Design a protein with these regions (language model features):
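Helix-to-loop junction signature of class
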Residues: 52-63, 129-140, 170, 206-220
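Membrane-interface helix termini and inter-helical loops of multi-pass transporters
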Residues: 3-5, 137-146, 182, 221-223
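Short, solvent-exposed helix-helix connector turns and helix-capping sites enriched
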Residues: 38-39, 65, 141, 228, ...
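Cytoplasm-facing ends of alpha-helical transmembrane segments in multi-pass membrane proteins
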Residues: 24-31, 80-107, 123-137, 161-178, ...
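Intrinsically disordered, low-complexity terminal tails of fungal membrane proteins
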Residues: 175-191, 250-267
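Membrane-proximal first intracellular loop
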Residues: 1-83, 87, 96-99, 106-115
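Extracellular loop 3-seventh transmembrane helix
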Residues: 13-17, 72-84, 129, 146-163, ...
């Protein structure tokens, strides 16, 4: 007996293939940068971009396999979780940037705890959303699907709250270091202003994407956003591709410290 399709529309092969190609190229670019700079804490960018590549590839393949549950689960899970991995590297970069500028006293949270607190919260969001996606993909009833959507919604809301708290830490640090620059901010090799600007851009894009997902799941499976394909590409795929493009110029290995400076790759 043939399985019933979980797709409310026929996934586009063309758009899916385009996004798969874009994310594959971005994965290669990030991998090259990673090994050239040795910034191993940026590995979540690579893993997340691989998730996106496989996820959109699965969407494209689903055009001719709409009844395939494995393909449906694969694309739903990987595309949902990839931005959480991007956020993990964003969180880790702020702490290293604070250390590089010698401005630890300007952070409202001890620098050694920034990564632990926010990446820990990120892992929690990952687990919640993964559980919700699993429940949703395997549900055979409306009640089961609603439970899965509610769990995902909870994970997304927690992620937004954590991200807003992170932005508060970044903004306060930014304000303090601009009003009272440290000696290390004069070092031309430490492009802290550019990196903070890019951090804000990336954070806003990820937040917009998360808000889109909240609205999408809050509206339910019969809502416009889940019933149509274009929103996921405009408010998720394109935004996350921009995030990866921006962050490809953001590897802190380019800010090579002197021997007496704090290593940006340290925890």
């Amino acid at each position: 007996m043939a399985q019933e399709s979980r797709w409310p529309y026929s996934p586009s092969v063309a758009v899916g293939a385009i996004m798969t190609s874009i994310f594959a190229i971005l994965t290669i670019l990030h991998t090259v940068r990673l090994f050239k700079t040795g910034t191993w804490f940026c590995i979540p960018f690579i893993v997340g971009s691989i998730f996106e590549t496989i996820g959109y590839g699965a969407r494209a393949a689903s055009n001719s396999n709409r009844e395939s549950l494995p393909l449906y689960i694969m694309q739903a899970l990987l595309i949902l979780l990839a931005p959480i991995l991007f956020a993990a590297s964003v969180y880790m970069i702020l702490g290293r940037l604070i250390r590089a500028t010698g401005a630890e006293s300007y952070a409202i949270i001890r620098v050694t705890r920034i990564t632990k607190i926010f990446v820990g919260g990120d892992i929690l969001c990952f687990l919640i959303q993964a559980m919700g996606a699993g429940m949703l993909s395997g549900a055979d009833s409306k009640e089961g699907k609603d439970r899965g959507q509610n769990v995902i919604l909870c994970g997304l809301l927690v992620q937004i709250i954590i991200f807003l708290l992170f932005l508060l830490v970044a903004i306060i640090f930014d304000k303090r270091i601009r009003s009272r620059p440290t000696g290390k901010t004069l070092d031309a090799s430490i492009t802290w202003e550019r990196m903070l600007s890019q951090l804000y851009i990336v954070s806003v894009l990820i937040t917009i994407r998360n808000l889109f997902r909240v609205i999408e799941y809050a509206a339910g499976e019969d809502g416009y956003l889940l019933q149509n394909e274009w929103p996921i590409y405009v408010f998720d795929a394109v935004l996350m591709a921009i995030v990866l493009a921006v962050c490809n110029c953001w590897y802190v290995g380019t800010m090579r410290p002197r021997e007496d400076d704090i290593d940006l790759n340290s925890a």
